[in-house]
Amino acid sequence: MAKNEFDITSLTPEQRDARLALDVERLLRFGRRHKLIKDLDVLVARNTLLDLLALAAPSEAKPPKEDPETPAALLDEMVELAAQKELFDGAVNQYRINFETRLMGALMPRESEVCKKFRKLYVKQGAKAATDWFYQLCVDTNYIRTAQIAKNIQWNTATPYGELEITINLTKPEKDPKTIALERLQPKSGYPACMLCKENIGYAGRINFPARQTHRIVPITLAGEQFYLQYSPYAYFHEHCIMLHEQHKPMEMNKQTLAEIFDFVGQFPHYTCGSNADLPIVGGSILSHSHFQGGRYVFPMQKADIAVPMTDIRYPGVKAGILNWPVSAVRLVGRSSQQMQNVANNILSAWRSYTDESVGILAETDGTPHNTVTPILHYDETEGYILDLALRNNRTSEEYPDGIFHPHKEYHNIKKENIGLIEVMGLAILPARLKDQGAQIAEILAGQRPNTSREPGDTLAVHADWIDELIAKYGTHMKPQDANKAVKSEIGTVFSHVLENAGVFKQDAAGQAAFVRFMQSVGFKKA
C-alpha cells in the first residue's frame, strides 16, 4: 500500500470512489506538470481514466499541490482501490501491474509524437538532448520502474582485475502461486513474438506477458538496417537502453553486426553499446531477436588496463592489447571507425575458426560452431573509439555439461545462469534469493544462528560447502556488520571466479601464452 494520509483499506464504497476520482485529478496534474499531456488533452485523459476506474463523474475537490518525481506511489494507491472495486483480480500480482500500466497509458503521447519530438531534439540540440528527453519520458510514465530498481542491493568488490559491481536483483516481481496456476491455463500465443518486438507498443498484456501501454520506441538506422531505440523497464544501470531490429530475426555476429555497433556509437557517442554473443550458453537470454544493449554508464571492464600491448603494422592507427580481465578480451583503440572495424573483423574471422587443443579450445564439433565474441564499444574524446572483444566458446563436455567456459558447478549457489554481455562487462546480476540467504549466512558467521545447512530441506543447503569454507576462514564470532561485509565480499569474489570460468584463455602462464599465440595468428606482435 502506498503512503497516504489515511488508511485506504477501510473506506466505504462512496469514500473509495471519491478518493479514486481525486486520484484521477492528481494523476492529471502530474501529467500536465511533467508535460505528458497538454491542456487540450486533459478532457480525453480524464474520461479515459474515469472509464477504466468505473467512475460516474470527476472529482469536484482540488488535488493537493504536490509534485512527486514519479507517479509510482499514486498509481499504487489507484491500483489498490481498483482492486477493492473488483475491477480485476487483485490477488494476482501480474494483473495489478498490467492495470497500473493501463492507467498510465491514458497519459501517454502517441508513438508518432514521441518520434517527432526525439528527432527534432536530435537535429537541433544533439543526441544527448534527445536521449535525455526520451529517458525522462520513460521515467515520468513509470515505464522505467525506478521505485523497484531502488530496491536492488548493490556493492563493489575489489579483485585483481579492479572493482567488480554486484547487484542482487529485486526489481522483477516474483510470481505468486495464483499467477503460476493461471499461466498454465493460458492458451499459447505467438503475439507479440517476443518481449523485444516492435508490436509490444501499446500491447494490453496478459497473465504471462506484461502490459506495454506506456512503451515507446524511436526508429534509428544502423549501417543501413532499421532498428528501434527503447529503454529497459527494469534497468540494470543508468539509461539502460536496447536497440532492437525491426524484424524478429535471430542474433548474429558478423561484419554487419560490428558496423551497426559502430554506427550507433557514432550517432550516440555518450552511450556504450554492446551485443550478446550469437550462440547458446555464451549468449544472452534472448537469442531469437537481433538486438544490442547500451547506456550512459562506465562499466568495470572499461576501467581495466591493457596487460599485454600489441600492434598490427597493417593498422598503425589502432592500438591493441590483451586486457587485464577475467573474461579473455582484446582491446582496440583508434579514431578511425573503419580501421577499427577492419581490425575487429580480422579478429572475429580468425577466432571463428581457431582451435588450440592444448587449452581446450575447439572451433567446432561435428560441424557445430563454438567460437564467437561479445563486443563492447564506447567513445572517448581523448582516445577515440574503444572496442573490447571478449572471446567466447560454448563447448560442453562430460565434466562440464552446462559449458566448459560457463559458471562451474561449485559456484552455482551464487551464479549459474549464462555469462552474457552485462556480466562480461563486470556487473553481476544475481538472484533475489541471495538477499535473505546472504543475511542468514552472515548471522552464522556472527554466531547469531546455528549452521543447519547440512540438514535435509534447509534453505541454505545449496550453500553448505561454501558456508563450511567461510566458517573455516572467518569463524563464527564476527561482529554482525563485519560478517555482512565479509559475505558481500565473498559473493563478489565468487563472481570473479565465475568470470574466470568464462575466460577461454586462463589466467595462468599457459593460458596467457596461448592468448598471445592467438593474437600472433591474427597478425599482431607484442609492442
What are these regions (language model features)?
Residues 238, 270-272, 285-287, 300, ...:
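Coil-to-beta-strand transition motifs
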Residues 280-288, 366-372:
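Beta-rich nucleic-acid/ligand-interaction surfaces
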Residues 2-243, 247-250, 324-326, 340-344, ...:
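Active-site microenvironments that recognize anionic phosphate/pyrophosphate groups
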Residues 256, 265-285, 294-348, 352-355:
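Catalytic or ion-translocation cores adjacent to nucleophile or general acid/base/metal-coordination motifs
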Residues 214-216, 246-271:
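Helical scaffold of the NTase/Pol beta-like nucleotidyltransferase catalytic core
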Residues 1-2, 265:
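Intrinsic structural disorder
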